[in-house]
A protein has these predicted regions:
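Structural signature of the histidine kinase catalytic ATP-binding subdomain
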Residues: 17, 38-41, 69, 78
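A generic structural signal for solvent-exposed, polar alpha-helical segments
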Residues: 21, 34, 66-68
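Conserved beta-strand-loop-beta-strand hairpin that lines the nucleotide-binding pocket
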Residues: 1-12, 57-83
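STAS-typified acidic loop motif
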Residues: 11-24
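Conserved polar catalytic motif of the HATPase_c/GHKL fold
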Residues: 52, 56
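Conserved short strand/loop->alpha-helix "switch" segment adjacent to the catalytic nucleotide/phosphoryl-transfer site
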Residues: 27-51
């Protein structure tokens, strides 16, 4: 049984590098994974992994600098049934 629907799709979005963007990162990821028809368990694991990576960028790379105008870009692509 396939975990991912057979379709090619790519989306990316830029977010400000601050902790208030993390909810938007999760929402964006969930939306893309829903379009790809990924099962709920896998979707939530992927959202968690991407959100943790984004949180590490905010926490470690920018030291929780709320004044940062820097952007982080999340891109999710599926080609030939591969994320």
């Amino acid at each position: 049984m396939s975990e991912i629907a057979h379709q090619d799709h790519s989306e990316k979005k830029a977010f400000l590098v601050n902790s208030s963007s993390l909810r938007d990162v999760r929402s964006f990821c969930r939306g893309v994974f829903e379009k790809l028809q990924i099962n709920n368990d896998l979707k939530e694991e992927l959202v968690l992994a991407i959100a943790e990576a984004a949180q590490n960028i905010v926490k470690h790379a920018f030291k929780n600098n709320a004044d940062s105008n820097e952007l982080m870009v999340v891109q999710i692509s599926c080609e030939s049934n591969k994320l």
